[in-house]
Amino acid sequence: MNTTLIQYPAKIWYKLANYCLKSYQGLTQEPRVFLMRKLARFEIVRDWVAMLFNRSTKPREISRAKASVLGNLDVNAIAATIETDSCYQGLQLPQDVVQELLTFANSTVGYINRDLNRPWPCKGTEKVGVDLPENTRVCSYMSNIEKSSTVKKLEKDPGILAIAAKFLGAEAVHMGSEISWSFPVAGNVVQQREAAQVFHYDLDDYRFIKIFFYLTDVDMSSGPHAYIRGTHNGKKLKHQFMGTRCASINDEKILEYYGVQNVVDVCGKAGFGFVENPLCFHKGTEPTAKPRLMLQIEYAINDYGNIHEMLGY
């Protein structure tokens, strides 16, 4: 008897049962988050929600940001670029702010592969295969980031908030921040997926935005962030239905549909920043020679609490 023919239906039933169980848990424990994750993948739903928020939000004069650590900002132009290209590049942190964040990172305990059971005093100077613990691909400071007064100031920076509010069409709700290292450690596709090093898109709200800053110099050997221009809209219907499970699709298949010519690798010196609509296909590429340290700050239109803790990432 062919055992493969028996095992295949069993696997399908197991996956179906597991899906139903997780759906039930999500619907009963966090219904708002559960429904958002199911509905926000569809562009027509996101557009409808954005229209409602735009109608209910009082007009604000935020075309120019004042008293920002980022200097003078043309918020309208930044938001317009994100709407067409999925991302805006060109923000710049002052070097004293970069140094404050580096000092924080070098004196604070991080967590290997975002595992709270694997604390590590990471400095980014460790030699792969020598100083780093086994299988260390990333090291995130997770909740310890709340100890950084510099990060807290950036979260409330008038310029950053103005960019977020203009793009969102609503008052920006801070969802979370993260500082993390990515190390030049080769991995298989499963490990790359766990480290967000394959093309995927996020579903953290109906409309949300992320601001990134490199805290070390990043070139093509340091694992630059990459995105596929314009893919926050016009996704293949199959990819809308799949949602975050698009991370299981090979990058080659994603590029075959959306075009390799639309891939943008973001390189820059320490302090360089960019703003992205995370509904576009994006990834952190795998470093090949040097580690990368990056700060990200996220805002949305709804307050779900610590959504990343709920979702386990």
What are these regions (language model features)?
Residues D204-M220, C267-G268, E298-A300:
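Short, conserved beta-strand element in jelly-roll/cupin
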Residues N2-L27, V45, A67-S68, H232-G243, ...:
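Non-heme Fe(II)/2-oxoglutarate
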Residues M220-C280, Y304:
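Double-stranded beta-helix
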Residues Q192-I209:
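Acidic, His- and aromatic-enriched active-site or binding-groove loops in soluble protein domains
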Residues N18-C20, V33-T84, G90-Q197:
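Non-heme Fe(II)-dependent double-stranded beta-helix
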Residues I179-F183, Y201, F213-D217, R229:
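Short, structured patches in soluble enzyme cores that scaffold and shape functional sites
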Residues S148-K153, Y258-V263, G284:
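Active-site rim elements
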